[in-house]
């Protein structure tokens, strides 16, 4: 039998020990004890990173639209609900016509004219009547009393008073507020003005009209006459009022409201998109 030839122990070469230094081609070996060094990217020292924390007790919260979460007073809540209802429901033309008002420039000229004919205050009226009474009391017997002064032109207010002036065709211009509540109080005035051929206009708002007559609010005011100096200005306002309101039949036929909310429009768009996708899939079959 042939025996295997074995080399002596001295003749065998020991394997080279692994070193940390690697060749140019091989990757650098990191020892277990050493930490891996992370390379940092260069940045401009002028701009430092500022991480914000919006938790409780930390950074100031960013500005958001918190209208939906606001706890409004009751009267404001009713105003908001009424506004939304007028947008969602179908509003008939008779009520919707009160949304059409004079433009800003025309309204400024109108209120400048009306401001000249504000009714006198109670204290001024009392002083004027007292002066007339004293003059009459001072006249001796047998002499004619001093003639009363010519009544000054001024605004007339109050629904009953304005209605009577319109029926008698004494009103030169009728001004109606757009936000009268309930609207039934002035709902018939535009029709009555057109029937009696009296120029009328709708303006913002009842509080502004109330200031003219020393009241908190006023639903409507009527101008029975003006001085000769203001006659041209009144004629221009009457012409624009007739053109926009009396002779304009389009805004009396237009329905209002009937607009969906944002979420409702999004749901409808999503539904239409799904229906279109389904019909496309059926057509391919």
Swiss-Prot record:
A cellular component term (GO) from this record?
cytosolic large ribosomal subunit
For this protein, the parts annotated as crossing the membrane are none
Gene3D superfamilies reported for this sequence: 3.30.1330.30
Question: Carries keyword Cell membrane?
Answer: no
Which regions are flagged for Low complexity bias?
1-24
- Superkingdom of the source species: Eukaryota
Task: Specify whether Hydrolase is a keyword of the entry.
Answer: no
Region ranges (Disordered): 1-27
Give the keywords, sorted: Ribonucleoprotein, Ribosomal protein
PROSITE patterns associated with the record: RIBOSOMAL_L7AE
The entry lists its GO molecular-function terms as: RNA binding
Q: Give GO terms for biological process.
A: maturation of LSU-rRNA
**What's this protein's family per the entry?**
Belongs to the eukaryotic ribosomal protein eL8 family.
Q: What is this protein called?
A: Large ribosomal subunit protein eL8
Q: Which gene is annotated as encoding this protein in its UniProt record?
A: rpl7a
């Amino acid at each position: 039998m042939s025996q295997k030839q074995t080399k002596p122990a001295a003749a065998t070469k020991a394997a080279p020990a692994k070193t940390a230094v690697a060749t140019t081609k091989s990757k650098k070996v990191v020892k277990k004890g050493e930490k891996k060094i992370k390379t940092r990217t260069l940045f401009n020292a002028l701009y430092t990173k500022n991480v914000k924390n919006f938790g409780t007790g930390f950074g100031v919260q960013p500005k958001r639209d918190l209208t939906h979460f606001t706890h409004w007073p009751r009267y404001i809540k009713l105003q908001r609900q009424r506004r939304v209802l007028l947008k969602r429901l179908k509003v008939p033309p008779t009520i919707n016509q009160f949304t059409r008002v004079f433009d800003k420039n025309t309204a400024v000229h109108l209120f400048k004219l009306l401001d000249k004919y504000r009714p006198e205050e109670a204290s001024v009226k009392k002083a004027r009547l007292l002066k007339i009474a004293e003059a009459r009391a001072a006249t001796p017997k047998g002499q004619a009393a001093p003639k009363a002064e010519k009544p000054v032109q001024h605004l007339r207010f109050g629904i009953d008073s304005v209605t009577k002036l319109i029926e008698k065709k004494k009103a030169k211009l009728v001004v109606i507020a757009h936000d009268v509540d309930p609207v039934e109080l002035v709902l018939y005035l535009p029709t009555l003005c057109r029937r009696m051929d009296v120029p009328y206009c709708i303006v913002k708002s009842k509080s502004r009209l109330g200031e003219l007559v020393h009241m908190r609010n006023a639903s409507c005011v009527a101008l029975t006459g003006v001085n000769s100096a203001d006659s041209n200005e009144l004629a221009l306002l009457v012409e624009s009022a007739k053109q926009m309101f009396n002779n304009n039949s389009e805004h009396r036929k237009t329905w209002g409201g009937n607009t969906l909310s944002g979420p409702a429009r999004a749901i409808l768009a999503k539904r239409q998109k799904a229906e279109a996708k389904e019909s496309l899939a059926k057509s391919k079959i």
